[in-house]
Amino acid sequence: MIIVKVVLPLPIRKYFKYFMPDSMCPIIGGRIVVPFRSKDIVGIVISFCNKKNISNLNLAFVKSCIDTESIYSDVVFSILIWLSRYYYFPIGSIFFSILPKYLKKICLIDNKNYKFAILRKTKYKDFKTFNLLFFCKKKSFIDKDLEKYTFFDFFLKKNFLQKSCKNYFYHENIPHIYQNYLIKKKFFLNKKIIFIINKILMKNCFTSWLITKNNFYLKVKFYLGLIKECLSKNLQILILVPFVKDIYQILFFLKKYFNVYIDIIHSQLNNEDYLKKWIRTKSGKNSIIIGTKNSVFFPFLKLGLIIVNQEHHLNYRNLDQCRYNVRDIAILRAYKQNIPIILDSDTPSLRTLYNILHKKCFYIKFIKNKKTFFLKNNVIDLRKERIKIGLSSTLINEIFNNIQKNYPVLLVLNKFSFVFFGLICRRCGKIEKCHICNDYFETKKYDNFLFCRNCLIKIKKPLFCYNCKNFSLIVFDFGIKKIKNSFKKIFPNINLFFLLSLKKNKTKKLKIQFFKFPISNACIIITTEKISQHYYFPYVRFIALTNVDHYFFSFHFCSIEHFLQFYFNLINLTGENKKLLKIFIQTSYPNNKFLLNLCSSDYFLFCRKILSLRKKYFLPPWNFQVIFYSSSKFFEKSFIFLECIQIILKKQSKRDNVSLWFVGPHPVFSLKDRKKCFYQLLIHSPSRTYLKKILKESINIVQCFSISQNVQWFLDIDIY
């Protein structure tokens, strides 16, 4: 009898053991149905356990096997196990998070796809029934969809519907990757580009390349030649992008030149389409995949090249509890599959530039000397100006000047200083304030606490108003209401567009035109830093950054790097209007050395200075840091848990004569949700291998104590 190790879709850092009956044939990476407590759930077989004496073991039996082959490729399987060990994240959560939704249930990969024909359509008078029947006729349904709609059983019994045909996902009429591909448009490459392409593909092994600061025309020619060479060898290509808007831009461009099957992957696909594309990739029926984060985990049949567009972007960083960077996973996958990877960015991350210095990554350059273009910017000192709703009088005058010229204006707000929920009394109108900094307390709609963003104080939500003693306290959205009303007063007869949320995008059809802001007449577009990057503004000639002080006074040492990347990529939001674009920056600290050099310095000159500063103060990428996060219902327990880890690490480092630096533990808001509070402990070490080893030992010791069961914790490794 075989014992199998199984992972379940639960946030638990361990696997479970089950007996496998002799009649079943288990497969590593395949799904099985196992009993867990009072119900049956789907698990994934990780490995087999060899034990001679199994008579003393009290293990449950596996109910059934679902798959006859592994649903993960060998490379993806090894990457997922490495992720769980490196980031100390629950292994079951990782394995199930990358699967299509249908495969998380008891659903076969070769699931049937039914269509229906209407019978006796003249004999019923109910208009709703008639509409439902036509809905069934137009669409095709998977087996699992039939369970959702209860009216199917009724219609089939009454002979209103008949199953007319059934198709399998594997037998779709799709051109196979091994068929001869066609080129729609011919293109010619110069000797320099051909030489670089041959250099990349000649070795047939893992190499990492950075392409930056090059002419757009030459870059396009280079990518066309590289993709053509890969397709001629019957290889699949993965193109990673940070935003959905970039997918449709690249798709439109590739379809002009290549007549091959191209799939797009993003979070807004429905479950059925996502599963179809996952199966097509596994069986090798598509040639190119353009996708966002999760497409890096797709089970490619024969992957030959990975391209990471805008490799510096923060959108690649996962802000859940498993805080990996998709760029790093793509590099690891290329290394394991022995294929080249291209990192593309006009403002590459400091980590990539550090790898170039140490010859871990190679630099692609087509032109020796390219003229650098400097953006026209003006820095406004907020201390010397009259301010209305965060806008200075100079900025307001400049906005009116641009509107008189019939140009649209883009205002980029700092989200966390404008938009928040507060507690207000309906009767007297009093707003709850912090007693230390006199700023407004913030809250959530369904939370029972008030907190101050500046002082990191958290208190219980009062039951009544302390001013009028009335039980009429309500949660009110101060930011958006306040901004809209104030802007309408200052700019009364001007069109205002508020792009403050992405929720409306999901209801609309995704096309390349949707992401372009089409209005060319005078208007003011108000948005935030994060949301502005999801759109193109081709007619904008003036951009204003209303407040950038949070970058220069952030506790995160990478904040200046992120600001520089955002600033130098503003030109990408407006398209071809480089010379006409003006940028105004509002700040209370205009003498900051980084702001003073923005007009005259290149991005790479800034990077040299920042890298030398980090080397001087022993910061990553020269040294290594890990942040331990913990949260609990009781803040004292999460603080004690981190103190225990700190004591264990200090004792072990003294024993090994290695210096570790600690900051904390202290309270902090999470990166994804600023309303959620954690305790964090920062650990600094000169050696990555030693830090990894000592963390493993300390975590094993801490898990012996009962306090670890009352605390949720996770690690943030490779902070850069």
From Swiss-Prot:
What is the name listed in the Swiss-Prot or TrEMBL entry for this protein?
Replication restart protein PriA
Principal EC category: isomerase
Among the entry's GO cellular component annotations, what is one? Answer: primosome complex
GO MF terms listed in the record are:
3'-5' DNA helicase activity; ATP binding; ATP hydrolysis activity; DNA binding; zinc ion binding
UniProt function note = Initiates the restart of stalled replication forks, which reloads the replicative helicase on sites other than the origin of replication. Recognizes and binds to abandoned replication forks and remodels them to uncover a helicase loading site. Promotes assembly of the primosome at these replication forks.
Tell me the cofactor note: Binds 2 zinc ions per subunit.
Please provide the record's keywords in A-Z order. Answer: ATP-binding, DNA replication, DNA-binding, Helicase, Hydrolase, Isomerase, Metal-binding, Nucleotide-binding, Primosome, Zinc
> Is Nucleus a UniProt keyword of this protein?
no
What the entry lists under InterPro entries is as follows: Helicase_ATP-bd, P-loop_NTPase, PriA, PriA_3primeBD, PriA_3primeBD_sf, PriA_C, PriA_helicase
Residues noted as binding ATP in the record, renumbered to the chain? 213-220
Q: Which reaction does it catalyse?
A: Couples ATP hydrolysis with the unwinding of duplex DNA by translocating in the 3'-5' direction; ATP + H2O = ADP + phosphate + H(+)
* SUPFAM superfamilies for this protein: P-loop containing nucleoside triphosphate hydrolases
What's any GO biological process attached to this entry? DNA replication initiation
Cofactor dependency: Zn(2+)
Q: What is its EC number?
A: 5.6.2.4
- Residues annotated to bind Zn(2+) 1: 425, 428, 465, 468
Q: Which family does it belong to?
A: Belongs to the helicase family. PriA subfamily.
Which one Pfam family would you cite for this protein? PriA_3primeBD
The protein's matches in PROSITE patterns, at most eight in alphabetical order, are given as: HELICASE_ATP_BIND_1
Q: Which residues bind Zn(2+) 2?
A: 434, 437, 452, 455
UniProt motif (DEAH box) ranges: 309-312
- Could you give the subunit structure recorded for this chain? Component of the replication restart primosome.
Q: What are the residue boundaries of the Helicase ATP-binding domain, all occurrences included? A: 200-366
The answer, when asked if Isomerase is one of the entry's keywords, is: yes
